[in-house]
Amino acid sequence: MADDMTQATEAPRNFTINFGPQHPAAHGVLRLVLELDGEVVERVDPHIGLLHRGTEKLLEHKTYLQGIGYFDRLDYVAPMNQEHAFCMAAEKLAGITVPKRGEYVRVLYCEIGRVLNHLLNVTTQAMDVGALTPPLWGFEEREKLMVFYERASGSRMHAHYFRPGGVHQDLPMKLVEDIRAWCDQFPAKLDDIDSLLTENRIFKQRNVDIGVVTKEDVLAWGFSGVMVRGSGLAWDLRRSQPYSVYDELKFDIPVGKNGDCYDRYLCRMEEMRESVKIMIQCCDWLMKDENAGEVLATDSKFSPPRRAEMKRSMEALIQHFKLYTEGVHVEEGETYVAVEAPKGEFGVYLVSDGSNKPYRLKIRAPGFAHLAAMDYMSKGHMLADVSAIIGSLDVVFGEIDR
């Protein structure tokens, strides 16, 4: 009996475990060092950098056109949204105006990217808490969207489709019609996923009141995107500082109120419906005959001359050769451009010294700030809740490690 009493007064020993980097719920190469008291999380220490490729430094040694490809490889779930930010920064420094049709094509593909991202996130978040059907249904729809990417750019993921001044090529009318037809059937598929998850008792038990962040926390940690809107702040760059043609489009901004994993899930589900509304408006605009025209600024130094012109004119041939070897010299200056990427505010800070390559390019990845708060959000939760919280943060290591 005496021995039992002495054991009871001993200090409890916490133990440390590694979560990842090969864990399926880590959403990439994330290593979390977890300190546990029994099954309660005391401390979370994210170890990042396992996918670091030195993107920002590599961009300093590439021309502006060559640099676009690196942005596809950041958040590789929705590549064109990142290209958009970089092209807008280059346009701002070079003083290029994008033709209206080019802007509508850009917005259409940015919203396809948003649906691609949210479909992956919502369905894998369900998989993290034990539901296997949603990913199978969601990936079927993602596959169709990947085909739209491929039909526009030739590639399913690393599109390299946006250019400073617009987009590389106009969309075939059949493709626009197919996207429009997809928009009509997709909400029913979304309802199917909705019916499986939203009122599901197990799904709610695993997500409600897990990983709560208040409005004050959101501002203090520098969150953006769904992480902000899930806590009740209607902050969306497409509405608060409109870029491209978002000010001409009608859409709502879904907002949560509790700031937990469940509200963030609901926000993403609703955002997909809003993205479909935007896609329908873009397709309808692009299909009108009076809106035909250029998709790439013809007066821009970034635009290559047409093939027919190159066969006739020596100057056009020289311009083409110079554009793809030396690249374009962009005026000296610096600028910051942010877009509302699916994960939050994706920003590009571009400094030009007047040469054909960026002098410095800083990438502001939204997931980086979200992962930084992992310790704060997980403290006091159970070990099983850690994967639910990571799932609702929506992290991709291409952009976090860069």
Curated annotation (Swiss-Prot):
- Bilayer disposition of the protein: Peripheral membrane protein
As one GO molecular function, the record gives: quinone binding
> Where does the record say this protein resides?
Cell inner membrane
Its transmembrane ranges are none
- Which EC numbers does the record give? 7.1.1.-
- Which EC class is this protein assigned? translocase
Q: Name one GO cellular component term.
A: plasma membrane
Keywords assigned by UniProt, alphabetized = Cell inner membrane, Cell membrane, Membrane, NAD, Quinone, Translocase, Transport, Ubiquinone
Q: Which residues form the signal peptide?
A: none
Which portions of this protein are annotated as coiled-coil regions? none
Summarize the protein's role: NDH-1 shuttles electrons from NADH, via FMN and iron-sulfur (Fe-S) centers, to quinones in the respiratory chain. The immediate electron acceptor for the enzyme in this species is believed to be ubiquinone. Couples the redox reaction to proton translocation (for every two electrons transferred, four hydrogen ions are translocated across the cytoplasmic membrane), and thus conserves the redox energy in a proton gradient.
Quaternary structure and partners: NDH-1 is composed of 14 different subunits. Subunits NuoB, C, D, E, F, and G constitute the peripheral sector of the complex.
Q: Which family does it belong to?
A: Belongs to the complex I 49 kDa subunit family.
NCBIfam families from the UniProt entry: NuoD, PRK06075.1
Q: What is this protein called?
A: NADH-quinone oxidoreductase subunit D
Gene behind this protein = nuoD
